[in-house]
């Protein structure tokens, strides 16, 4: 595994946390000191909000930082049907027994992973409420169905991504949610950085990458 795993179903086996470790360093070209800011947040056990447009490198940045910090990365792609049980866990029938299966958030809290909630604004508001006690100094995860409250281990880190340009009356983050996170701003990289990224990812020379980007920018109407 080289880029972490996206969690779509609850995972209950704690030994499976190693499946979320990133084996090879993902390439990332730092732009505005974001590596240092994220490192400070991780050391201080602070949650982080990555703000920026779609396609500006937020997900690759999280993968890069998970590798640098040596922590597992559990990615959850948020959507309007995502429930609190999808994140926390649920009881499932297994043979003749009913067993509890941890969700990705619970697994990360117990095992010290970075849990990345991608495009958090897509999730229902009643779902995002469960991250509030995790995103302040309590660092607690209530599991109502089990009558338990779990305290996050030191290496657990909560990261969310948010596109400020994608807002409506129905879809936006509450201020009470935003203010709990250290915000790191992202934007599309400058041409020289973008050329380096394309050259590395496509395995072409810098000159070829620059020519490719000219074509793309012309097509998108970007300067």
Regions found by a protein language model. Give the residues of each.
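C-terminal regulatory/interaction module of P-loop NTP-utilizing enzymes
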Residues: 1-223
């Amino acid at each position: 595994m080289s880029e972490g795993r996206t969690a779509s179903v609850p995972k209950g086996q704690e030994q499976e946390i190693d499946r979320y470790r990133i084996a090879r360093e993902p390439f990332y070209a730092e732009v505005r000191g974001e590596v240092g800011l994220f490192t400070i947040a991780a050391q201080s056990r602070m949650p982080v909000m990555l703000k920026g447009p779609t396609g500006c490198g937020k997900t690759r940045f999280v993968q890069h930082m998970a590798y640098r910090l040596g922590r597992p990365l559990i990615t959850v792609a948020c959507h309007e049907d995502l429930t609190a049980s999808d994140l926390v866990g649920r009881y499932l029938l297994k043979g003749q027994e009913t067993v509890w299966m941890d969700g990705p958030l619970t697994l990360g809290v117990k095992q010290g992973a970075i849990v990345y909630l991608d495009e958090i604004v897509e999730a229902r508001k009643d779902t995002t409420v469960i991250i509030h006690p995790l995103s302040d100094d309590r660092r607690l995860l209530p599991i109502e169905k089990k009558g338990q409250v779990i305290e996050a281990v030191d290496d657990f880190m909560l990261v969310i991504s948010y596109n400020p340009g994608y807002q409506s009356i129905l879809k936006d983050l509450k201020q009470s949610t935003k203010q709990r996170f250290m915000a790191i701003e992202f934007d599309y990289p400058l041409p020289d950085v973008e050329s380096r990224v394309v050259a590395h990812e496509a395995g072409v020379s810098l000159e070829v990458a620059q020519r490719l980007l000219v074509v793309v920018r012309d097509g998108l109407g970007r300067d």
